[in-house]
């Protein structure tokens, strides 16, 4: 259980029920009797409430429309994937060999779902306040400024700002390959800085693949 102990140290939370923790980390590709989809469903609802309450009290003079925009900027796949990187959540997941070989541990959708499942498991074991304490700490560590201006960015924009500030160069994205039928194509995009390839990623659209490639660069800052 050394692997799980390391994750608990990252979280600052000790699970009483290790089976529940393992369930939260088990992807459906494992084809086991349990996976983390039900806990993900629960965690999604819990985090929606926690972030909504957090914003309600933090921004006392902000109207409902802007509060909703702020919550949408924080409660989404990209945000949760970034937060997951703090605790290296992908390293602790139980995946099939095929999913692991397909870079599953670095897929934003997969680690985002696992974060929701993990928070759902903590909620079941210790209640709302425990989840709130852990998640808000992660949230505030990830985002120095929580406001509409700073949260309205995407991975490509963030990467471009960094490379322009450091090198005066804008990243370039190129299509590597595409596959599948017209109604269900997948695209592999590569991101370059000058002539150096920084990362590749696959998505259901070119835009999605570009975002995932930019995310990979930001996680490793492989520049």
UniProtKB/Swiss-Prot annotation:
Q: Could you identify this protein by its name?
A: Ribonuclease 3
Where's the DRBM domain? Answer: 154-223
- Pfam families this protein is in? dsrm (PF00035), Ribonucleas_3_3 (PF14622)
Q: How does it assemble?
A: Homodimer.
Q: What is its main location?
A: cytoplasm
Binding of Mg(2+) occurs at 40, 113, 116
Sample GO molecular function, one term: rRNA binding
Q: Which reaction does it catalyse?
A: Endonucleolytic cleavage to 5'-phosphomonoester
Q: Which NCBIfam families match?
A: RNaseIII (TIGR02191)
Q: Show the GO cellular component annotation of the record.
A: cytoplasm
Family assignment from sequence similarity: Belongs to the ribonuclease III family.
- For the keyword Coiled coil, the answer is no
Q: Which cofactor does it need?
A: Mg(2+)
The listed locations are: Cytoplasm
Does the entry feature the keyword Transferase, yes or no?
A: no
> Which BP terms in the Gene Ontology apply to this protein?
mRNA processing; regulation of gene expression; rRNA processing; tRNA processing
Per the entry, what this protein does is:
Digests double-stranded RNA. Involved in the processing of primary rRNA transcript to yield the immediate precursors to the large and small rRNAs (23S and 16S). Processes some mRNAs, and tRNAs when they are encoded in the rRNA operon. Processes pre-crRNA and tracrRNA of type II CRISPR loci if present in the organism.
Q: Taking every annotated instance into account, which residue ranges of this chain make up the domain RNase III?
A: 4-127
Enzyme Commission number(s) of this protein: 3.1.26.3
Location of the active site: 44, 116
The protein's UniProt keywords, in alphabetical order, are: Cytoplasm, Endonuclease, Hydrolase, Magnesium, Metal-binding, mRNA processing, Nuclease, RNA-binding, rRNA processing, rRNA-binding, tRNA processing
């Amino acid at each position: 259980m050394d692997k799980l102990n390391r994750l608990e140290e990252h979280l600052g939370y000790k699970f009483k029920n290790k089976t529940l923790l393992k369930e939260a980390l088990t992807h459906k590709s494992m084809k086991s009797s349990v996976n983390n989809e039900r806990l993900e469903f629960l965690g999604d609802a819990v985090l929606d409430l926690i972030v909504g309450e957090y914003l309600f009290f933090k921004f006392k003079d902000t109207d409902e429309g802007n509060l909703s925009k702020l919550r949408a900027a924080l409660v989404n796949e990209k945000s949760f994937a970034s937060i997951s990187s703090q605790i290296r959540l992908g390293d602790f997941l139980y995946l099939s060999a095929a999913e692991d070989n397909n870079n599953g541990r670095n897929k934003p959708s997969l680690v985002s779902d696992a974060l929701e499942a993990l928070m759902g498991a903590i909620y079941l074991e210790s209640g709302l306040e425990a989840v709130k304490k852990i998640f808000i700490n992660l949230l505030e560590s990830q985002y120095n400024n929580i406001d509409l201006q700073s949260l309205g960015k995407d991975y490509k924009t963030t990467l471009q700002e960094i490379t322009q500030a450091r090198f005066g160069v804008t990243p370039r994205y190129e299509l590597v390959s595409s596959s599948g039928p017209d109604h269900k194509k997948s695209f592999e995009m590569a991101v370059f800085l000058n002539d150096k390839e920084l990362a590749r990623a696959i998505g259901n659209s070119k835009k999605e693949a570009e975002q995932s490639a930019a995310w990979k660069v930001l996680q490793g800052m492989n520049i």
